[in-house]
């Protein structure tokens, strides 16, 4: 759910389950980022909401994402268009969750036919951000856009992909 619809409460739950507190989990995230070479990143929460001490770069997001894409489980979620949460002993019905990354949704105007998967994010200070993978003519690219506005969030990524696919 966290990757498909930015369910920030799920991020907090994951952090508390793994590390006891969100602060401790953020320390683990920062440590792992540094191990991946993402040296201009510091996490202070598990969901990305603004904090002066919570920061990253497009390059660092690329490095972190490339590491994730080495995992089959990560790729399965990264490329998922939807997920059905099964019924439990607490909730008797299933719940369908759809990916909110519009470049992946065929019925939307922002759809990009070569997009494989991705993650979006937004808050007032960061603007609209997206990390997206696309494949065309056997070539796979990863694009990170940051600080976009609503009108250009997906156009920015598409323009970058098209430029890179054209000028190998």
Where do the PLM segments sit?
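Signal peptide-directed extracytoplasmic domains
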Residues: 1-4, 26-27
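Substrate-binding clefts and substrate-entry loops adjacent to catalytic sites
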Residues: 4-17, 44
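Penicillin-recognizing serine hydrolase domain
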Residues: 20-168
């Amino acid at each position: 759910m966290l990757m498909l619809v930015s369910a920030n409460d799920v991020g907090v739950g994951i952090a508390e389950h793994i590390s006891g507190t969100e602060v401790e989990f953020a320390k683990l995230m920062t440590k792992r980022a540094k191990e991946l070479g993402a040296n201009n990143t510091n996490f202070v929460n598990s969901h990305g909401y603004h904090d002066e001490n919570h920061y990253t770069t497009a390059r660092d997001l690329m490095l972190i994402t490339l590491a994730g894409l080495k995992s089959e489980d990560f790729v399965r979620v990264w490329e998922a268009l939807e997920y059905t949460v099964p019924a439990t002993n607490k909730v008797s019905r299933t719940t369908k969750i759809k990916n909110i990354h519009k470049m992946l949704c065929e019925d939307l105007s922002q759809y990009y036919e070569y997009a494989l998967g991705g993650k979006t994010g937004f808050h007032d200070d960061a603007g609209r951000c997206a990390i997206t993978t696309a494949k065309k003519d056997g070539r796979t690219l990863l694009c990170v856009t940051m600080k976009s506005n609503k009108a250009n969030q997906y156009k920015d990524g598409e323009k970058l992909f098209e430029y890179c696919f054209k000028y190998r």
